Regions:
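Phosphate-binding site of ATP-dependent enzymes
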Residues: 174-258, 279, 284-285
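Hydrophobic beta-strand scaffold residues
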Residues: 109-110, 138, 157, 312
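ATP-binding N-terminal substructure of ATP-dependent carboxylate-amine bond-forming enzymes
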Residues: 1-111, 115-116, 121-122, 126, ...
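ATP-dependent carboxylate activation and anion-phosphoryl transfer catalytic cores
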Residues: 1, 250-329
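Active-site nucleotide/adenylate-binding loops and adjacent lid/helix of ATP-dependent enzymes
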Residues: 2-7, 75-80, 118-199, 210, ...
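Short small-residue beta-strand/loop micro-motif enriched in glycine and branched aliphatics
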Residues: 112-113, 167, 241-243, 297-301
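Surface-exposed charge patches
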Residues: 26, 101, 129, 262, ...
Length: 329
């Protein structure tokens, strides 16, 4: 079976994907590299070309090679060549289940969660319903038509795209001017609106190993440089602090780990996931679950693996075994 790292994509998170692919390429030097470009074409990519791309979070990657076809054609080739896809992809059709179902109908093994789980987790509104059934507390939603009343009631709101990642489109609602911004943004995509919750940002990974063990990784405490953990704070500002393990009390750490595990199971995730929380004065509050969290050198999940004493390459090898085993079932 030929191990192939698939990266890029047609959505806003393709820059992060390139950085994840660089980390995966370094850990899996014998893997082939396929770059999925914004026009849906797929390109075989040289290792040197990927690794010399020095500013992946800021500049678009250019494969510099001829296309092997559009994504569906590339997946047909992956099936005929007995390839296993290691997904260095994030967001959009790469994480919402569309790519996953295209692989499943062809019998192509791939890392990460399956299509059904990916689809549910990617929709923040639907995911909240699933995790709440499992006993995970999440903020109450605010209908767009009630946003003015909710702002008067709560004093501050948070609005974000219901199906997007890396905190793209995040709007803090403090005034009528912000309400106008939300309404304008909601014309092009569905927005999730919630009361602002004061507290410490936290995230907690969950890992499935090839021997069947499923457990939570050490929670991470996040202190954004500019007050919100958006794309810039995540990947561009060195002053953002990500403390792993987080400086939480033993009780709060245990609670975060339990809730992350519950969310992973409630959403039927596979392989690995990462769930984000706000630790309020009343305890951890669920925000969202990522089925393909970033795997860049600057990303949170690899930091949690390191804190757990797990080598990145061992994590990847386990995910490859899990992907192959799932396809054989």
């Amino acid at each position: 079976m030929r191990i192939t790292i698939l990266f890029g994509g047609t959505n806003k998170e393709r820059l992060v994907s390139v950085a994840s692919a660089q980390a995966l390429c370094s850990a899996l030097p014998k893997a082939d590299l396929w770059f999925w470009d914004v026009d849906d074409s797929v390109h075989e990519t040289r290792r040197e070309t990927l690794l010399k791309h020095s500013r992946p979070f800021e500049q678009a990657f250019v494969a510099g090679s001829a296309s092997i076809g559009r994504l569906e054609e590339a997946l047909d080739r992956a099936r005929s060549e007995d390839r296993l896809l290691v997904l260095a992809l994030h967001g959009g059709s790469a994480e919402n289940g569309e790519l996953q179902v295209m692989c499943e109908v062809r019998g192509i093994p791939f890392t990460g969660s399956g299509s059904a789980s990916s689809n549910v987790a990617f929709d923040k509104v639907v995911a909240k319903r699933f995790v709440e059934i499992a006993g995970v507390k999440a903020p109450s939603g605010v209908p767009l038509e009630d946003i003015e009343r909710a702002l008067a009631q709560y004093g501050r709101l948070v609005a974000k795209p219901a199906r997007d990642g890396s905190s793209y489109g995040l709007i803090f609602v403090n005034s009528k001017q912000d309400i106008v911004a939300v309404r304008n943004a909601a014309k092009s995509e569905e927005y999730l609106i919630e009361p602002f919750i004061a507290g410490v940002e936290a995230t907690c990974g969950v890992l499935e190993q090839s021997d069947g063990k499923l457990f939570s990784l050490p929670p991470i405490e996040i202190i954004p440089a500019e007050g919100s953990f958006d794309y810039t704070a995540k990947y561009l500002l060195k002053s953002t602090q990500e403390i792993c393990p987080g400086r939480f009390s033993p009780d709060v750490s245990a609670k975060l780990m339990d809730l992350a595990l519950r969310a992973h199971r409630a959403l039927s995730c596979s392989g690995y996931s990462r769930t984000d929380f706000i630790v309020s004065e009343h305890g951890p509050i669920y925000l969202e679950t990522n089925t393909l969290p970033g795997l860049t050198k600057a990303s949170l999940y690899p930091k949690a693996l390191k804190a757990q004493g797990i080598e990145f390459v061992d994590f990847l090898k386990d995910q490859i075994v899990i992907a192959e085993r799932r396809t054989r079932r």
